């Protein structure tokens, strides 16, 4: 008898509530996956900054290689 009290609400949940819940969850998730215009601009800006930082690091390493050849061994 106690199993019946648990089985009926669980069956209703699995048959009606769970499919609607999953459908709403994943339909909202797919709509949010696109980046907004400001997010795309920020991403491009960060990529440019990373490129400039990489170039500066390479320049600094070439200066250190010329002035102190064994600096990487430390």
Swiss-Prot record:
Assembly:
Interacts with PspA; could bind PspA only in the presence of PspC.
Coiled-coil positions are 33-68
Tell whether Metal-binding is among the UniProt keywords.
Answer: no
From what organism does this protein derive? Escherichia coli (strain K12)
Q: What domain of life?
A: Bacteria
Q: Does the keyword Transmembrane apply?
A: yes
GO annotations under biological process?
Answer: phage shock; regulation of cellular response to stress; regulation of DNA-templated transcription
Q: Which UniProt keywords apply?
A: Cell inner membrane, Cell membrane, Coiled coil, Membrane, Stress response, Transmembrane, Transmembrane helix
What NCBIfam families does its record include? phageshock_pspB (TIGR02976), PRK09458.1 (NF006993)
- Family classification: Belongs to the PspB family.
State the annotated membrane topology for this chain.
Single-pass membrane protein
Where does the sequence pass through the membrane?
A: 4-24
Which locations, inside or outside the cell, does it occupy? Cell inner membrane
Organism phylogeny: Bacteria, Pseudomonadati, Pseudomonadota, Gammaproteobacteria, Enterobacterales
Where is the major localization of this protein? Answer: membrane
Annotated Gene Ontology cellular components are: plasma membrane
Q: Which residues form the signal peptide?
A: none
Its name, as the record gives it, is: Phage shock protein B
